[in-house]
Design a protein with these regions (language model features):
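Non-catalytic C-terminal interaction segments of nucleic acid-processing enzymes
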Residues: 68-150
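Surface-exposed cleft-lining segments at the edges of enzyme active sites
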Residues: 23-38
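Residues at beta-strand starts and edge strands
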Residues: 3, 58-59, 137-140
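Well-ordered, non-membrane alpha-helical segments in soluble/globular domains
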Residues: 34-46, 79-86
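Nucleic-acid nuclease catalytic cores
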Residues: 48-79
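Low-complexity, flexible helical/coil segments
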Residues: 42-49, 99-102
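Conserved catalytic cores of phosphodiester-cleaving nucleases, focusing on short active-site segments
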Residues: 1-25, 47
Length: 150
């Protein structure tokens, strides 16, 4: 009936090789947590922009699945360049977010624009799957709902 429910999915992994039920899984180290955080929030912004231009929007979803546990924690470096984009557990993302002034051009390439969110988005990570007790054996997920404007 012409209604829209956009969904953005991001999947980032920590390097690991696992054998489960005689099947071997090889996951690459994807790194670039700073860019991963930026891109997740950019997905929310993109769905908000779509919502604001469409009469057919119902609601939207952003989903991130990761085995990289550092996403759940606040940045550890004092001069962290992506602090405003951090999607650590328990945070709330809203408003205008920018890279720090000391961010390298290579890090920001193609991602120079600030992220501006009109809604408030709680960051609540949940366990998706636990393969084993190693650092790379747990997968977590994050879901945010972008609601229709009233």
């Amino acid at each position: 009936d012409g209604k829209w429910i956009p969904i953005e999915l991001k999947y980032t992994t920590k390097k690991c090789i696992k054998t489960i039920n005689d099947e071997v899984y090889v996951l690459k180290e994807q790194g670039a947590k700073d860019q991963g955080c930026y891109n997740y929030l950019k997905d929310i912004m993109r769905i908000e922009e779509f919502r604001d231009k469409s009469n057919n929007f119902i609601e939207g979803y952003t989903i991130k699945i990761t085995s990289e546990m550092s996403y759940l924690k606040p940045p550890t470096k004092v001069n962290c360049t992506y602090a405003e984009f951090s999607i650590e557990d328990g945070s709330i993302k809203t408003g205008c977010m920018n890279w720090a002034t000391n961010t390298g051009k290579g890090t920001m390439r193609g991602m120079e624009a600030p992220i501006v969110l009109t809604g408030m988005y709680p960051i609540n990570w949940k366990e998706y799957s636990k393969v084993d007790d190693t650092k790379s054996g747990t997968f977590m997920y994050l879901v945010n709902i972008i609601s229709k404007k009233n």
